[in-house]
């Protein structure tokens, strides 16, 4: 299992790149840390690694799904994204599903570097914006996105169709 930073006193350079198949272990390490951070059911690392390996190899998307941040060769953060074609304004958007920085790498510029990497990708591909959500209780994340210039859109409501709803809808 790749190590994750317990504490970064001098983060040095933050290296960001799109995840590759050989990053499955690093991605799994962050997914497990993210589940613990958000007080979700803890993930089994080997299962997370197998799933990450599948995501990074078999699905072969038209765009990358995960950006990973490394500091001193250690995995420090991730961004999980999807590209959407909304239609109404004929402009593609990137949806930032998750931005997670390992506890020991927080407040070291890793999150900013990840979002900067995504912004550069968007500009290079003609993608007009990044949409994202965060928990309303996550004051640190809200301050972070405010500092980046993110606009809050109160007219939007976040909804989810969980597994049971999917099954019910699919049967009708």
Spans of model-derived segments:
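Helix-loop element at the rim of GNAT/NAT acetyltransferase active sites that forms part
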Residues: 29-43, 87
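Active-site rim helix/loop that mediates acceptor-substrate recognition in acyltransferases
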Residues: 44-66
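Conserved acyl-CoA
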Residues: 102, 113-129, 151
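Active-site acidic-Proline motif in GNAT/NAT acetyltransferases
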Residues: 102-104, 108, 136-137
């Amino acid at each position: 299992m790749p190590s994750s930073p317990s504490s970064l006193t001098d983060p040095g350079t933050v290296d960001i790149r799109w995840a590759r198949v050989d990053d499955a272990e690093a991605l799994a390490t962050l997914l497990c840390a993210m589940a613990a951070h958000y007080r979700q059911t803890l993930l089994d690392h080997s299962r997370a690694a197998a799933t990450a390996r599948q995501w990074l190899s078999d699905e072969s998307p038209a765009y990358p799904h995960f950006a990973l941040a490394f500091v001193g060769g250690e995995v420090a953060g991730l961004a999980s994204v999807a590209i959407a074609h909304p239609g109404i304004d004929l402009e593609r958007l990137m949806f930032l599903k998750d931005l997670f920085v390992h506890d020991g790498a927080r407040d070291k510029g890793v999150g900013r570097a990840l979002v900067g990497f995504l912004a550069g990708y968007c500009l290079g591909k003609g993608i007009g914006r990044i949409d994202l959500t965060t928990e309303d209780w996550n004051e640190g994340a809200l301050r972070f996105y405010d500092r980046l210039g993110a606009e809050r859109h109160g007219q939007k409501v976040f909804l989810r169709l969980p597994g049971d709803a999917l099954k019910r809808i699919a049967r009708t």
